[in-house]
Amino acid sequence: MSEEIDRSNYSADNIQVLEGLEAVRKRPAMYIGDIGTKGLHHLVYEVVDNSIDEALAGHCDLISVWINEDNSITVRDNGRGIPTAIHTKEKRSALEVVMTVLHAGGKFDKDTYKVSGGLHGVGVSCVNALSGDLRATVYRDGKIWQQEYKIGKPQYDVKVIGDTTEHGTEVQFKPDTTIFEATVYNYDILAARMRELAFLNKGITVVLTDLRTTDDDGKNPSDTFHSERGLSEFCEYLDRNREKLIPDVIYFEGENDGIPVEVALTYNTSYTENIQAYVNNINTHEGGTHLSGFRRGLTNTLKKYAADSGMLAKEKIEIDGDDFREGLTAVVSVKVQEPQFEGQTKTKLGNREVTAPVSQGVSTMLSNYLEEHPAEAKIIVDKVILAARARHAARKAREMVQRKNVMSGSGLPGKLADCSEKDPALCEVYFVEGDSAGGTAKQGRDRHFQAIMPLRGKILNVEKAMIHKIFENEEIKNIYTALGVRIGTEEDSKALNLEKLRYHKVIIMCDADVDGSHIETLILTFFFRFMKELIELGYIYIATPPLYLVKKGQKSEYAWNDDQRDKYIQEMKGSGLESSVGIQRYKGLGEMNATQLWETTMDPEARTLRQVTIDNAAEADQIFSMLMGDEVPPRREFIEKNAKYAKIDV
């Protein structure tokens, strides 16, 4: 995939310097996305990307990542080691140049790395600038070299601290707490990315270990990610909770017009498509030219096969591209020397030269498979025909959703208690479980900017429903209407149209019990599958009602978890007995009166809202399919590990 380079040829003079570091600390979000959870974890990805580049060049097969007890991070690889010799132009060690100058590194020298990862491509120097402390250790040329930095500034010249027979680079850093709003690393977020990298770069091993905690046996949580079959295994992982339509993962790897292309795809019995597209290991959430090439290759090849085999002869309906992608799970990975990223979040590939190579690769792979597997080919085409029929039914149902908006005067559902403010940026709507809790919420809200929409019972599980059934569902029609969301734009008849979106905060408020969690998940599944843009824009939130009211005499406190409850019990009992303290466990929102609901859950000054974000699209997709699909054991295991109510009400 990348040119082989002798270890000796990766030298100080391969390091190219493009610009200085000053701006990073002033405007960190420009370089790493944000200064919250996403940016914090992005620092780790930048360092790991350096090691992945070494792996792509054929010089590294083991990357180890530790979350240390103090929330610092250590990344170690067995690559060639960053060069330490004096840089000809800079007149200082190449290691210091790489660590202190933005965009300095071998990845900008095409002879050193043919392709390199990293969305922002800012390299490890950016991590250095945003770290309170960083230590770089290089094992190279029989010596151990080291340099330490504070907020990006070297504390001493690069020095030799010992001899070694090993080779590689180790970077330990602690993010600067004066810059980052979030400072605690989430093991699961890092694990999802390390797993993804192992699938995308087959043959390498990535080990993640959390030194902050131990299990019952006294061992630190640790995962080893390694994949011999790469994207084929990735597809199987994404689909592991879905029922297979065909037994195989169809796989292609090759180089067309100098662009390495790797594709894996399979079909399941669900009604959703799940295509994960990557460029240089970056998940391009907004798609781009490689995704267009994939879709074109898939549609044209399947259409031709279906027509040539006579399977479409009796069908009176037109088949379109979407029909070929219902139930499809695919991973597309391309390596591009100079990627051009576009779109809102800079995750849309713009290189036009990528479309044809991907399209050709998919066509060749799929044509061969269909010819060699006629039974599976027939199953796929039969599903396509069913999808086309369902799409025609869904179009009529979608038109009914639109008509409901237009025909019903204000276009708002009768159950919606709207707010008086008309600026969507200042308005919020609560989707509340049940009419009785909805009544309490209506009494407790601030009518100026808070709207209440009660939902009756459990909404439809969209993961298992055919698309026309979804748009015929009354509660789902009401959600579209209440939000002012329409379907169809000038460019795309099925795209989400947010021009008349009425609220910039959509808050899901359910009971604090197992049923409430289930309803919350059903609503989130709907948003993830049909209104993902609202999640990506940061508009979806989950309310956090208290679990307990702890009371003694005139004194009362709300508790949101068991630790808080126990703390208040100890404070209130004083020298008395615990039984002297009254504890009310709130199982439903209806158990609180309007004032209590306002004070704890709806008052912007006092409430806690959890914003719903998608850190890893591939991981989110498989979690939703697992939670809302048919397989019970993985769902039970996930809930026991993650749900705060699992042990209370089961």
Show the residue positions of the predicted features.
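Short adenine-binding "F-helix/F-box" segment of the Bergerat
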Residues: H87-T88, L95
